[in-house]
Amino acid sequence: YEDTEHMVYAWAATGEKNVSIQAIYNQVFSGSLYHGKEKTVDLPSGASSGTLLNRLLMKENPVAGTVTIRLTKEENGVTFYQDYVTRFDRTLTLKDMTAQCDGAAAALEKEDGTKGFTPGVKTYSVTVSMAAQNLELFLSRYEENACYGEEDVGYRIRVDGTDVTAEGGVVIPLDGTINTQTVTVTVENNKAPDGTGTYTLNILKSPPVEVTFETEPVDALLHLRDVLTGVQQLPDNAGNYLLCEGSSYSYALTKYGYEAVSGTLTVTRDDAGALVISNGTETYPVTETEGGGAVTIVWTLNPAASNPAIDPYIPAQWADFRGSSTNNGVTDVLLPTAAQDGTLYWANQLGVGFDSDAVGSPILVDGDIITYAGDKIYRVDTVSGEVKVKANMDHKSSFSITPPVYADGMVFVALSGGTVQAFNAATLESLWIYTDKLGGQPNCPLKVKNGYLYTGFWNSETGNANFVCLSITDEDPAQSKESKCASWYYTSKGGFYWAGAYVADDFLLVGTDDGGNGYTSQTSRLLLLNPATGELLDSWDGLNADIRSTVVYDAGTDAYYFTSKGGTFYSVQVTGDRKLTNKWSVNLANGVGGVPMSTSTPVVYNGRAYIGVSGAGQFTPYSGHNITVIDVGARRIAYRVETQGYPQTSGLLTTAYEQESGCVYVYFFDNMTPGKLRVLRDRAGQTTPDYVTTEGGRTTAYALFTPTGDQAQYAICSPIADEYGTVYFKNDSARLMAYGSAIERLEITQQPAKTAYAEGETFDPAGMVVTAVYANGKTRDVTAYVTYKTDPLDGGDGEFAISFPYVMYHNEENGTEMTSGVETMVPAVTLNLTVGDGLLGDVNGDGKVDQADAQMILDYEAKRLDTELSLKAADVSGDGVIDSSDAVLILQYAAGTLKEFPAAAPKETEDSGSTDQIAVGDTGLPKE
């Protein structure tokens, strides 16, 4: 019996009558309940199905089993019996065997041509390049199923006679020749001295083909992978690739601004037996040598056609997750610091719930908000919250956590199923779609650098997922959903979740999940990758559980910072030769217990780092949740301040008040209903919180704003801000919201062209400029957003109200506590109008009769005006018609040659004398 088998069935039959048959054996088991105890099993004679001899043998434990089959018959008071004794010895197998060649996976092949390891199959081959230096074998044994009383199952593994049990494998040097090398692996156990398992591994050599790729442009990105193993092929120090005969390699050649090419290269022999490399379209002959061969492959990329609809110069005020190339959320805008100085301006529900129909986190492009919800992408007005443009996406996102990213006139959104879709930033029309072959949730922030987009996906706690690099070029303007191929990808167990990359010109840093369930495994990593190839340059391994923060760079300390879900704050530097150095960490705390998780991307400034930390219960209020301040120089926690909910996202720091007060202000959202916006005040050397609110007897970080009613919900959104000090955010109410510095007053900084009206006319705002003056001193033209009476004017409209309607509510301090939901008064200003019969001849309502009024009548008659004119003001002739004769009279009046308009003269009877007549064409102006 192989040691993987343990189910024993017995059949027995006898031709005699009245004979009973029994199987008798001592049981083997992991516990004392059964182990060593005799068991008797009745065997029905001649049964068609066998009877299970349970616990005669153990799975994956080679302890032998002996069973006695006893036939018993009673006759005349005498018992007769016959015993048949059977011993079950075990043959031994390996649990698993895998191989790597020079760090890349090497596939084991059975004699029947199938791939992979099967314990009962004893002969394998593996094909490697003749140029390979080492083959590493990973060998595992059965260790889990010990019998009661055993300390160890007792397996030993030898490779060519050397015991490698403790190491779990061996590195086999390769001799650099074409000759096959043979390795013998044996598995032994003292409980089965005659059952030793012997495996034979034949290492076959494939002479390498040295491939030189010459590309145009020369800096195009080439990505090669072995189709069978999935392992990326990287060039040697001379820039050449060593490919093996009989192998196939997928490739992608990409460059920002060019059309990508992709396909499969196969190293094979043609019908004449010559060694060639082919991609199915082109064949490249190999110059063979004793050591393999060489070939040069020349590939030229075509420049992508220009898409004139894309404006690459559209500005962005907040282009991506943290609004900066460093991922450090530091700004200098004048954000509100006191509750009474701010207000919620608007809350627009664009989505539903908090999963695939949720509203996405926003960015700011060309003065507008770009976000998405469900399968729609939106451009939203920052002042009113009204949707300006709406367009369709290919499909929905997973949880709409990741904000879009803007670059070069395009917006990119991560969608479910490992998808990224590109849109025209102005029109929101689709440009292209990328779909990752491993799929996954799109929970990582997107980052664009030098024309390439970087992001990661997540499938499960233990599943593989990719981190990808994409050229952002619209390669085919004629297609709106062309399929984008990746410039490169890097696969990691556990994938990438909320882990955004820091991307420099010559390296990038990104964290991984730990690949295990829960958040205690010490197996996550910080990867240092080549941004052009995805090559792993260095890594920091064995980190504390999932890395679910973006990596931040702080120029002041020339270091990179991130946090872990296991409760650790990390710092590292990168050397000039792209290696990680000066690594250190700080264990986080919540003062209560449990794991002080952090998925918060640090904001770092002036030697201080600010992060959100979880309490003992992630969704339990006031259970130790806090904002933690790290003293970077001292490498310790300076202090922490409690919050109601876990500040699970990232802070926004403003330096706007530092010169005046020496303080910075840092803003975080609680991820717990109602989703409070809190602000921390801090300065260098501070060791205790000094800007707080009392909540239920607890001292918490200052509650600047509290959503109420339908707007109150959990909040997984890092705040962003514009130049006016307005913070934009979303929460699980599926609403996009704007909170900012309150409007202190409205000012009419330019009077409308018309301020005098006859009763019955309607107000014309042409020429008027209304300016909002904010509490932080900023000013803004809000003319397009104000409201006023649109009904006909009457005598009571001399003081004409202009108001700004987009205000809702705010918090208000009540001692050390905070009152939420306080209604914000609508800002308004009064415009003085003259409303009455009107000044005859004052057509434009500016209080004067002059040439401009005459010109307005001429424009009206020529149908060059979009508005109606007041008959009372314009019909100066009194004939009931507005025409050029009225314009002539106005010109005469303005020149002083006409004292009174005919329409103003007393009505005459038919017998009265005639008035002066003006000949047609005579303006009444002085002649030259």
Regions found by a protein language model. Name each.
Residues 201-204, 300-304, 731-742, 831-835, ...:
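A recurrent domain-boundary module in secreted/ectodomain proteins
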Residues 307-359, 363-401, 405-742:
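Extracytoplasmic/lumenal domain signature
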Residues 245-246, 759:
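Surface-exposed loops/turns
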Residues 225-239:
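Short, acidic Ser/Thr/Gly-rich low-complexity loop/linker segments typical of extracellular
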Residues 36-41, 256-303:
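Structured interaction patches on ligand/partner-binding surfaces of diverse proteins
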Residues 834-928:
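Cellulosome-associated attachment modules in secreted, modular CAZymes
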Residues 1-211, 216-219, 256-261, 301-306, ...:
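Beta-rich interaction/scaffold domains
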